[in-house]
Every structure is written in C-alpha cells, then in structure tokens.
Design a protein with these regions (language model features):
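Glycine-rich beta-to-alpha active-site loop
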Residues: 70, 101, 106-153, 157, ...
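NAD(P)+-binding Rossmann beta1-loop-alpha1 motif at the extreme N-terminus of oxidoreductases
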Residues: 309-366, 389
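Amphipathic alpha-helical segments at domain termini/boundaries
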Residues: 9-32, 37, 131, 172, ...
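Conserved N-terminal Rossmann-fold NAD(P) cofactor-binding segment
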Residues: 352-401
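Conserved CoA-thioester-binding segment of acyl-CoA-metabolizing enzymes
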Residues: 6-68, 103-106
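Short glycine-/small-residue-rich Rossmann-like dinucleotide-binding loops
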Residues: 119, 407-408
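Hydrophobic, secondary-structure "cap" segments at the distal end of domains
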Residues: 161-172
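Glycine- (often His-adjacent) and acidic-residue-rich active-site loop
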Residues: 69-103, 122, 152-155
Length: 408
C-alpha cells in the first residue's frame, strides 16, 4: 500500500483511528478524523487502518472488536471525492484499493468477532467496512443512511461491496441498490437484512459491545442468512444466465452503453455467483482504477464537486434562473432535465430528433413512477411535463439563464 499512499498522502501522523482495550479482550476502534467534521476514506486513513487493525487481528489478547465513530452524525461517509479528481494513475488506484479490500476480506474471515456500531452515514467504502463485520448494529438517528453510491461517480464498489451487499440483502435488492446508488435508512436496512439490529443513538455502542461479548462467549452465533427460494433458483446455471442477461439489457436500456460502471457492477456480481467470491473481489480491484480515469467518471466527479461548491455560494449573490437549457438528450442530459423540471422550465437541445423524443419519454416514465410511489402528485407530473421542451435549433435556448452541456 505504501507507494499509493505516499502518492496522495496529506499527513505525517496517524491519528484518524483510535483503539482502546475494554473488558473481556474487546477493542473499541473509533474513526475520528481530527481535521474534518466527517470521516472520509482517504489514503491516510486506509494506511492507518492497515497498521492498526492487522496487529489487532494477530494479537491473541484481543478477542473481538467494535467499530464506531466519534462523529455525531457520520460513521464513514465514503471517499474523499476531491482525491478522485486528482487520480491519474489507474495502477496506483488499484494498488491502494486492493490492499484495503484484502484487509477487509481477512477481517471478515477471521475468527475474532467484529461488530459495527453505525450512528450516522455509512456510504461507499465506509459501508464496505461495515459489511466486512460479523454483526451490524445501527442507530435510528435521522442521519443514519447506508448505501453504495459509487455508480453515481462512474465507478463501482471495489472493496467487497459487490459481493457482501448481495450476500446480506440478496441479488435482486443488492443489484438495485448498487445500480442506482440508492441509500436506505436504518429501519429499512433492518427490513432488508442489511443490518442486524436497530437501536437509539445513545445506545448503539453499548448494544454493539454487548453483541461482541455475546459472540465471544458463544451466547450469539454469527447470523446465517438462508437464501430465499428465488435466490437459490437464480443460482442454477440456466436461470442465472437468463437473469443476468435481463439485468444487462435493462442497464443498457437506461445508459445506452454510455456508462461502463453499471455493467462492471453486474459483471462482478455475476462472477461471484458463477466462480466464487475470491475471483470477484480481484475483478472489482482490477476495474476501479481504469473506471476512475474514464471521461464519464471525470465528468460525474466534476459534477458532484461543482454541486457541492455551489451549495456554499451565498443566496444573495445567486443569479435568478427562469429557464434551464441542456445540450444533449442522452442519459446525462435526461437526468439533469428530470431534476431541473422540479423547479424550472427546461429546453433540451440535440441534433437528433429521436434522442429528444426518447429523452421526453424517459422523463415522463420517471415521473409516472414517482406518482405511483406517491413522491409527487398527478398534478405535479402534468406541471413538470409542461415545463419540458426539446429542440434541434440552438437558437431556441436563447432565453435560458443557465445552459448545461451534457453531450458525450
């Protein structure tokens, strides 16, 4: 891990992870970046994780561990996205990710019980730490959300996420969460099987410690999740090929083959089913570096960072926007238009009339789904539909106060 960490390292000290030995040989492992309001996955944290956790796994005096966070509303909120924008060497990315992934695999397969006490957001690489634990206790704090949103940045979960999430919630729900970047709150996570127990924020660590002691003493066995019938049927070769074929077809219909990330997620999940978890874990690692430097990922990372930066602009200095223009009716343009229609009239430009028509149809279909889920009313659907227009003439966007280029 050393070469990759040195490439991006911002610190000379290791102070983001604190360890404390408790009774009965349980070690409290606390994530707490002193320089940030939230914990994020950085190269410095990853190297510290290796140097502090591996010795604990090898120490005979240590009987178990409880992972927690000192932050009031964050466990680990995924990666530091700014570092994604700086990454320019796919091999270094794979090296760093691979070292982290293999430590999590070793942790998950170890004989020492590891329990996660999740209070606040556990996203991306943060959730992958949680998934490597043997028992998960989550708080019902409003900020407690769990998810693998990597696809929204053009990449894939690459520290075991494509294997361990479906292992907990099943193939169908796991694929849905990863292919959409969907986040779930604690109570829904419990219903899905993503977490084992939900309690109040003030009790989450003590409950996790209690469960660690139960596991050590044999009063509680590590949860075994029997696959539902549909999952077992999907495991049959003929059914499996049909199932993953349909998943790929659905992904291609949504992305028009413009985004490689979702297909890589499907590939890794399928490989795990067909040839085992170990091969799939190595496939994850091999994909993360090349994906991170694709034009698609670069654009999505830029969009994320720009959006975050815009949130810091004082409202009084903001210019009033009455109409949004979007250049490009592809998947990205359609997505931006769908979000913008909630507040503004939108004009989408494309040289292809078919692309414009398809864009409008997909937006309408998305709005209809929102009506069915009661996210919006039928009246809101009609209002947003009327705000949408498409054109092949660039001059038709002259009245737009904001123009976004979304063409590939």
């Amino acid at each position: 891990m050393g070469t990759a960490v040195n490439h991006w390292s911002k610190k000379n000290t290791m102070d983001e992870i604190k360890t404390e030995i408790l009774d009965r040989g349980v070690v409290k492992v606390t994530f707490d970046d002193p320089e940030r309001s939230v914990n994020t996955m950085t190269p410095d944290l990853l190297t510290e994780f290796e140097k502090k956790i591996v010795p604990l796994m090898e120490d005979e005096a240590v009987k178990g561990m409880v992972f927690c966070s000192a932050k009031p509303d964050t466990f680990v909120a995924g990666a530091d996205i700014k570092l994604f924008a700086e990454a320019d060497d796919p091999d270094l990315v794979c090296e760093l990710d691979g070292a982290y992934s293999r430590i999590l695999t070793r942790l998950s397969r170890g004989d020492k019980p590891v329990v996660a006490a999740v209070n606040g957001a556990a996203l991306g690489g943060g959730l992958e730490v949680v998934l490597a634990c043997h028992y998960i206790v989550a708080s019902d704090h409003p900020a407690t959300v769990l998810g693998l949103p990597e696809v929204q940045l053009g990449i894939l979960p690459a520290a075991g996420g494509t294997q361990r999430l479906p292992g907990r919630v099943g193939l169908i729900k796991g694929l849905d969460m990863m292919l959409t970047g969907k986040r779930v709150r604690a109570k829904k996570a419990f219903r899905l099987g993503l977490v084992d127990e939900v309690t109040s924020p003030g009790a989450v660590f003590e409950k996790a410690l209690e469960r660690a002691e139960d596991l050590i003493e044999g009063r509680l066995v590590r949860p075994f999740r029997k696959k539902p019938l549909v999952e077992r049927v999907i495991g049959l070769p003929v059914v499996r090929d049909i199932f993953f074929g349909k998943v790929r077809k659905k992904v291609l219909a949504k992305t028009r083959n413009n985004y490689p990330g979702p297909l890589k997620i499907v590939e890794c999940v399928e490989l795990g089913v067909k040839e085992g978890m170990d091969k799939a874990l190595e496939r994850e690692i091999s994909h993360i570096g090349p994906l991170l430097v694709t034009p698609q990922s670069r654009s999505l990372v830029w969009l994320f960072l720009t959006t975050q930066e815009m949130k810091t602009i004082p409202l009084e200095s903001s210019r009033s926007v009455k109409q949004v223009g979007i250049v490009g009716a592809g998947a990205m343009g359609m997505g931006i238009a769908s979000v913008s229609l909630g507040s503004y009239p939108v004009v989408v430009h494309d040289i292809s009339g078919e692309a414009i028509q398809s864009c409008g149809e997909q937006i309408r279909a998305g709005l209809e789904k929102q009506v069915k889920s009661e996210a919006i009313t039928p009246e809101m659907l009609e209002e947003r539909r009327m705000r949408f227009s498409g054109t092949r003439e660039m001059g038709d966007m002259a009245e737009s106060d904001l123009v976004i280029e979304a063409s590939s």
